[in-house]
UniProtKB/Swiss-Prot annotation:
One GO cellular component term: plasma membrane
PANTHER family on file: UPF0754 MEMBRANE PROTEIN YHEB
Source species taxonomy: Bacteria, Bacillati, Cyanobacteriota, Cyanophyceae, Synechococcales
Organism expressing this protein natively: Synechococcus sp. (strain JA-2-3B'a(2-13)) (Cyanobacteria bacterium Yellowstone B-Prime)
Alphabetized UniProt keyword annotations: Cell inner membrane, Cell membrane, Membrane, Transmembrane, Transmembrane helix
InterPro entries attached to this UniProt entry: DUF445, UCP032178
Protein name per the record: UPF0754 membrane protein CYB_2931
Keyword Cell inner membrane on entry: yes
Cellular localization per UniProt: Cell inner membrane
Homology family: Belongs to the UPF0754 family.
Membrane topology field: Multi-pass membrane protein
Length: 406
């Protein structure tokens, strides 16, 4: 009998202390659901944790967000995730996927349609609005227009062949004998004839004064106008012979060939440049958006997109430049994130709603799974506590033996 007094209390304390953690955890979770007798819920059913799982989930989420996933920690985590090397690798991967898509004939048509819609939207919608806004500025396109005038128009000079072709077009299409006759008739109005006759009488000197005051120009000009009206074919033949006699084609060719803005005075050139610039700016302000939109509607954007994709697909420079492009884009993103990452994280954290995500995840986990997870943590990571419980139970049993012996 004395032997059991020495052995039973320490062994009982050892067993109780060792298995107390498992029993306590089970008591926290068991039973998983409430039990009722005659409609009356039996106390302590369900267990403490299943009964208060929603409140516990909110407390866990609050603790994690307040102590572990603080804005500073999330900011540091984002910095680690968005290192330049990782961003460069991600951008390189995206570019590689895009190139693979370009190389795939099955997806080329779909890609071309998407690109065509993008190009059409940029040209038909975005570009007209941009031109409308920029055209309000006084210096809009001032530099390019001045450069165009100085480097193209100011240096423009017709070659001999071009001048010859232009002179022939003027004499045959723009100002043929028929047009010259009609212009001459339109010019010789009664009022103009009177004015010419008076000017001739006033300005004539010497023998011409005698002719001007005795005969005048009025009768001759009236006869010329009448002849042009009554004998159009004869008048046109005379005008054609006159143009040949004075060698109008050669003279006009020489004039056109020697025609250059450089021969004008500097003040006249500046005035022309200013007038050209103002004219283009006024036209773009009033008609630019409509002209661009109308031009965009006449373009086959899907064909343009196919040509662009074809050039990109066969571009060796693009393929060999992927690493450099990804590195440059990564550096641009890095500079942007260095400046705005903190403000971005402050905007992202409320959107992520991490505390609610954690609470929902805890609520969605069954009590049995929660119990199993905690038991696994205790067995793997907190075994020393279990052993300590057994040791304390053994020591308590020994103390009881001492009390019994005393």
């Amino acid at each position: 009998m004395a032997f059991w007094i020495y052995v039973v209390p320490p062994l009982a304390g050892l067993v109780i202390g060792y298995f107390t953690n498992d029993i306590a955890i089970k008591m926290l979770f068991r039973p998983y659901r409430p039990y009722r007798v005659f409609g009356w819920r039996i106390p302590f059913t369900p267990g403490l944790i299943p009964q208060n799982q929603p409140r516990l989930a909110k407390q866990i989420a609050k603790t994690i967000m307040g102590s572990l996933l603080t804005p500073e920690e999330l900011h540091n985590l984002a910095r680690k995730l968005l290192q330049t090397e990782r961003m460069q690798a991600g951008i390189r991967w995206l570019l590689g996927v895009a190139l693979d898509r370009l190389q795939n004939p099955e997806q080329q048509q779909q890609t071309a349609q998407v690109l065509a819609r993008i190009l059409a939207d940029l040209f038909n919608e975005s570009l007209p609005r941009l031109v409308k806004v920029l055209a309000r500025q006084e210096t809009f396109l001032e530099g390019p227009i001045n450069q165009l005038f100085d480097q193209v128009l100011l240096e423009l000079r017709l070659s001999s062949e071009q001048a010859k072709q232009l002179s022939e077009w003027i004499l045959k299409q723009a100002l043929p004998p028929k047009v010259l006759r009609q212009n001459l008739v339109d010019f010789l109005t009664d009022r103009n004839i009177e004015s010419l006759d008076e000017e001739f009488r006033e300005r004539a000197t010497g023998s011409y004064w005698v002719v001007a005051n005795l005969f005048g120009l009025k009768n001759a000009l009236l006869r010329l106008r009448t002849y042009c009206l009554e004998e159009p074919e004869g008048a046109e033949a005379i005008l054609e012979d006159l143009l040949k006699d004075i060698n109008a084609s050669r003279r006009l060719t020489e004039i056109l060939q020697n025609l250059s803005l450089q021969n004008l005075p500097v003040s006249a050139v500046r005035q022309l440049r200013r007038a050209l610039r103002d004219g283009i700016q006024d036209y773009l302000r009033s008609q630019g958006p409509e002209v661009i939109k109308g031009l965009g509607e006449t373009i086959d954007w899907e064909k343009v997109a196919s040509l662009v994709l074809g050039r990109l697909r066969n571009s060796k420079a693009l393929i060999t430049s992927i690493d450099q492009i990804s590195a440059d884009l990564a550096l641009v993103l890095e500079r942007y994130l260095e400046r705005d990452l903190e403000s971005l994280m402050m905007q992202v954290i409320p959107v992520l709603n991490l505390d609610q995500v954690i609470a929902d995840k805890v609520n969605a986990t069954s009590p049995a799974d929660l119990e199993q997870a905690i038991q696994q943590i205790v067995r793997q990571e907190l075994q020393a506590i279990v052993n300590l419980g057994g040791l304390l139970g053994f020591l308590v049993g020994c103390v009881q033996v001492l009390f019994l012996l005393g």
